[in-house]
Amino acid sequence: MAKLQLNRIKAVLAEKSVSSKDLAQQLKRTESTVSRWSTNEVQPSVETLYEIAKFLDVDIRELLVSTKLP
């Protein structure tokens, strides 16, 4: 069964050319935690999603659903 992709953190990091290490340092979290978010193994809290969006300078919705046209 395919794993549900509940967040787009990995994709947005790539779009912004930001490493997971940079995000981990900014949020004072481990790289392992960011990796688990990026692979949708676990989900960050809404508050953490807000912090990620602020750091990446994107609308929080970008982290959940692609708003780009195909």
Describe these PLM feature segments.
Residues M1-S19:
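A short, Lys/Arg-rich alpha-helix, primarily the initiator
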Residues A14, Q25, K54:
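Alpha-helical residues within the helix-turn-helix
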Residues K21, S32, R61:
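Key DNA-contact positions within bacterial/archaeal DNA-binding proteins
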Residues R29-P44:
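Recognition helix of helix-turn-helix/homeodomain-like DNA-binding domains
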Residues S38, L56, L64-T67:
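DNA major-groove recognition helix of helix-turn-helix
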Residues E47-E62:
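DNA major-groove recognition helix of helix-turn-helix/homeodomain DNA-binding modules
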